[in-house]
């Protein structure tokens, strides 16, 4: 669990967001260490709790709220031979060029080379005449 700040409109339990990096106003903000210092660019986060503390912010339409976030489980396609529930492995993206499946081939929030734990096998997906497994994974932090 990570404590951070998000715009008031995003401060809702269950809401997910991708952190893309600091905005220009963040570079001189006194709250930057708490707000963006705990987040990793390119990662997906899920708000699990909203605290009753708010601060002014020029980037987020006036106000940010203190929230608790976690990295959620993410769905990704995987080679069937590696798709074993409970196993940990180094993530390798599959070769699938179907634009409709891009969010499952290279989901935002995961990077090739991440260590992940397979939480659940969700089913089979075909792409380019090959069968892959759709799995739900959690990133394992080093």
Curated annotation (Swiss-Prot):
Family as reported in the entry's similarity comment: Belongs to the UPF0179 family.
Coiled coil spans: none
Protein name as annotated: UPF0179 protein PYRAB06360
Source lineage: Archaea, Methanobacteriati, Methanobacteriota, Thermococci, Thermococcales
Pfam family, one: UPF0179
Annotated HAMAP family: UPF0179
Top-level taxonomic group: Archaea
């Amino acid at each position: 669990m990570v404590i951070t700040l998000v715009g008031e409109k995003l401060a809702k339990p269950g809401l997910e967001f991708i952190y893309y990096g600091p905005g220009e106003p963040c570079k001189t903000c006194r709250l930057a260490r708490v707000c963006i210092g705990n987040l990793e660019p390119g990662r997906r986060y899920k708000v699990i709790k909203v605290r009753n503390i708010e601060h002014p912010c020029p980037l987020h339409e006036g106000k940010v709220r203190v929230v608790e976030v976690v990295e959620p489980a993410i769905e990704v396609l995987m080679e069937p031979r590696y798709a074993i529930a409970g196993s940990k492995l180094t993530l390798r993206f599959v070769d699938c060029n179907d634009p409709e499946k891009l969010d499952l081939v290279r989901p935002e929030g995961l990077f090739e080379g991440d260590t992940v734990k397979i939480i659940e096998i969700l089913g089979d997906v075909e792409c380019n005449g090959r069968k892959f497994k759709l799995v739900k994974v959690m990133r394992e932090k080093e």
